[in-house]
Amino acid sequence: MKASRFFIGTLKEAPADAEIVSHKLMVRAGMIRRVAGGIYNYLPIGLRSIRKVEAIVREEMNRAGALELLMPAVQPAELWQESGRWEQYGPELLRFKDRKDNDFVIGPTHEEVITDIARNQIKSYRQMPVNFYQIQTKFRDEIRPRFGVMRGREFLMKDAYSFDKDAAGLNESYRKMYDAYVRIFTRLGLEFRAVAADSGSIGGNFSHEFHVIADTGEDAIAYCPTSEFAANIEAAEALPLIAERAAPAQAMEKVATPGKAKCEAVAELLAIPLERTIKSIVLATDNEGAEPTIWLVMLRGDHDLNEIKVSKLPGLKNHRFATEQEIVEWFGTPPGYLGPVGTKKPVKVIADRTVANMSDFVVGANEVDYHIAGVNWGRDLPEPDVADVRNVKKGDPSPDGKGVIDICRGIEVGHVFQLGTKYSEAMGATFLDESGKPQPMLMGCYGVGVTRILGAAIEQNFDDKGIIWPESIAPFELVLCPMGYDRSEMVREAADKLYAELTAAGVDVILDDRGERPGVMFADWELIGVPHRLVIGERGLKDGKVEYQGRRDAEATLLPADAAAATVTEKIRAALAH
């Protein structure tokens, strides 16, 4: 490719609405242009990187035995009504009517369509296992699209769906996809972690997320630096921090805490560690035709509630936070001074694992400006129901027993689920087993955010000059920068010779023949992030040299002009192999 025949749309300034590095640099590098909120044009230089991501994804999916197909972006509402997600999905599902007043959606995902294919095409256990995948445009009507391609409304995604006759087959399909994802993100040249995760709105019983590690990541990841453990903070098990409950050492005592409604303020006033205080959170579950059930969830003062964990407890799937009116009715006081001692009406108490082993702790007195100190289970309160209801914290023991937890930020770029029979039972996707009896198919679902990968890769690979692409997904692997291409025959001949040699060697190279000044030329390619650069100038050529610089290198080095193509080709191949 020659730059004079390519579109290079670099900008000196980022748009005002660009908040994070990847959004700013993708616009400035001429990769994307905004059409509407969360919807982008992908210009030629951006599309080149997308195609490289797609190629790696496609190769690894094919290697894992998945079969490519293509499903429509527009889906009939009937399929979503069958699965139950027409009502469940909410306003993110873009719905519309055609001219005949039929309801349709723009697909944010394709579980319904693929299940429809399976129930019509798969009749026998002999046709399984089978795994179908596509790379297709999706649309989710995000309430607040932001961060460029990181949280767009329209995006490109690879989604795969496996169908098996039994749990053993599903486990094997899941393992193959998990391994394929590890290969994909390794080949993409990204630092990533596979973490145990919650299945969210897709549903299912078992899932892992793949996160690119970046300080700007929206998700918190709990991991153990000395072991293989990693989990989304929503799913990470929080072990009890107190092994055994100590015997009471204090009498229960009501203490004045004027104006101190927060655990931190109470601890400071009473001159006790924050870890001695209890945070009381009131939840409610509605009962048709009757008053709600009120739940008091008790956490240590320095811990935070994990709503995902709470929603999985018996009776709390559809919980909500209690209203202030309900809190006053059940506890006799507004929020800030709540506790389990002497409630006005019965409540169900759930204590976090750590709280269940505490002694002589401080709770709200259910009276404004008062708390109760020296509270103990068994003596002052009945033994509670105990559950893991908190987020893990840095320094907590790792659930695998091999170290302590650390927390990092991650950008989710892939997700694998074991769906089980969630969709096949709802939509009647059955097969005849070995004995001729109908059984629901067991499904797996496996997604990769193709366009999101670009943003995540940039968040992990940039400097003050611009993007630093991994070789595998750079729009070009190498740029040739001739000094005076339009003026010097010596430079032009040397540049053209190098270009021909590199092209013949299979290097994805662009020759900058625009005749720009060196400063402009270098700034453009550093912004775009091409990982390797050769500079050809008359002075160097007279000594038989050209200048090489890797995008991450602080200094340039001189190479023999007649060996430069072979040397750089080897560097690129080594980087891709690594």
UniProtKB/Swiss-Prot annotation:
Q: Where in the cell is it found?
A: Cytoplasm
What the entry lists under SUPFAM superfamilies is as follows:
Class II aaRS ABD-related, Class II aaRS and biotin synthetases, YbaK/ProRS associated domain
Q: Name one Pfam family in it.
A: tRNA-synt_2b
Question: Which superkingdom, per the lineage?
Answer: Bacteria
Gene Ontology biological-process annotations:
prolyl-tRNA aminoacylation
Per its record, the protein catalyses: tRNA(Pro) + L-proline + ATP = L-prolyl-tRNA(Pro) + AMP + diphosphate
Q: Which PROSITE patterns does this UniProt record tie to the protein?
A: AA_TRNA_LIGASE_II
InterPro entries, sorted: aa-tRNA-synt_IIb (IPR002314), aa-tRNA-synth_II (IPR006195), aa-tRNA-synth_II/BPL/LPL (IPR045864), Anticodon-bd (IPR004154), Anticodon-bd_dom_sf (IPR036621), Pro-tRNA-ligase_IIa (IPR002316), Pro-tRNA-synth_IIa_bac-type (IPR004500), Pro-tRNA-Synthase_IIa_type1 (IPR023717)
Q: Is the Cytoplasm keyword given for this protein?
A: yes
Q: List the Gene Ontology MF annotations in alphabetical order.
A: aminoacyl-tRNA deacylase activity; ATP binding; proline-tRNA ligase activity
Q: What is its EC number?
A: 6.1.1.15
A cellular component term from Gene Ontology for this protein is: cytosol
The record's keywords, sorted A to Z, are: Aminoacyl-tRNA synthetase, ATP-binding, Cytoplasm, Ligase, Nucleotide-binding, Protein biosynthesis
Cite the record's note on assembly: Homodimer.
| Family of this protein | Belongs to the class-II aminoacyl-tRNA synthetase family. ProS type 1 subfamily.
Entry note about domains: Consists of three domains: the N-terminal catalytic domain, the editing domain and the C-terminal anticodon-binding domain.
What role is this protein assigned?
Answer: Catalyzes the attachment of proline to tRNA(Pro) in a two-step reaction: proline is first activated by ATP to form Pro-AMP and then transferred to the acceptor end of tRNA(Pro). As ProRS can inadvertently accommodate and process non-cognate amino acids such as alanine and cysteine, to avoid such errors it has two additional distinct editing activities against alanine. One activity is designated as 'pretransfer' editing and involves the tRNA(Pro)-independent hydrolysis of activated Ala-AMP.
PANTHER family cross-referenced by the UniProt entry? MITOCHONDRIAL RIBOSOME PROTEIN L39/PROLYL-TRNA LIGASE FAMILY MEMBER, PROLINE--TRNA LIGASE
According to UniProt, the name of this protein is: Proline--tRNA ligase
